[in-house]
Amino acid sequence: MVLCFPLLLLLLVLWGPVCPLHAWPKRLTKAHWFEIQHIQPSPLQCNRAMSGINNYTQHCKHQNTFLHDSFQNVAAVCDLLSIVCKNRRHNCHQSSKPVNMTDCRLTSGKYPQCRYSAAAQYKFFIVACDPPQKSDPPYKLVPVHLDSIL
């Protein structure tokens, strides 16, 4: 039992910094965080666009994709046929048409001086959708995760 505590402490220390990378800011709903991270109707330069995300998380996100469409149009994808997500849940939905998007990838820097490269794309996307929370728009389902780009 004496050996368990140091091992548990080591696991918590190693796991601690990784956990926030996948979490969303608790003062935001998952749908609002999705909108901040992935909805950008008019393309912005990646360094500028990513600073908005990185200011919430206090670190340089390694990669992010911005869909150049409205939240309303992306939320409408949630009404399409459900498919299996990467995590094996059945709450994903594929867009019926490709959209313009920008893929931003970290090239250098440490927060807050993060630097990104940009790649314009025109592809289909898959989003995970959940029922809305109280402060979300009143759709039946809202996008909460960008599962993949096709």
From Swiss-Prot:
Belongs to the pancreatic ribonuclease family. GO terms for biological process: antibacterial humoral response; antimicrobial humoral immune response mediated by antimicrobial peptide; defense response; defense response to Gram-negative bacterium; defense response to Gram-positive bacterium; defense response to virus; innate immune response; RNA catabolic process. The gene is RNASE6. InterPro entries: RNaseA (IPR001427), RNaseA-like_dom_sf (IPR036816), RNaseA_AS (IPR023411), RNaseA_domain (IPR023412). This is Ribonuclease K6. Glycans are attached at N55, N100. It is found in: Secreted; Lysosome; Cytoplasmic granule. It comes from Homo sapiens (Human). Highly expressed in spleen (at protein level). Has little or no expression in healthy kidneys (at protein level). Detected in interstitial leukocytes in infected kidneys (at protein level). Expressed in ureter where it localizes to urothelial and submucosal leukocytes (at protein level). Strong expression in lung and thymus, and lower expression in heart, placenta, pancreas, liver, brain and skeletal muscle. Also expressed in monocytes and neutrophils. Changing I36A: Strongly impairs bactericidal activity, bacterial agglutination activity and binding to bacterial lipopolysaccharide (LPS). PANTHER family: RIBONUCLEASE, RIBONUCLEASE K6. Its main location: secreted. Induction: Up-regulated in CD14+ monocytes in response to the uropathogenic E.coli strain CFT073. Ribonuclease which shows a preference for the pyrimidines uridine and cytosine. Has potent antibacterial activity against a range of Gram-positive and Gram-negative bacteria, including P.aeruginosa, A.baumanii, M.luteus, S.aureus, E.faecalis, E.faecium, S.saprophyticus and E.coli. Causes loss of bacterial membrane integrity, and also promotes agglutination of Gram-negative bacteria. Probably contributes to urinary tract sterility. Bactericidal activity is independent of RNase activity. Keywords: Antibiotic, Antimicrobial, Disulfide bond, Endonuclease, Glycoprotein, Hydrolase, Lysosome, Nuclease, Secreted, Signal. GO terms for cellular component: cytoplasmic vesicle; extracellular region; extracellular space; lysosome. The active site is at H38, H145. It holds the Pfam family RnaseA. The record marks W24, I36 as: Important for bactericidal activity, bacterial agglutination activity and binding to bacterial lipopolysaccharide (LPS). It is an enzyme of class 3 (hydrolase). Gene3D superfamilies: Ribonuclease A-like domain. The record marks K61 as: Critical for catalytic activity.
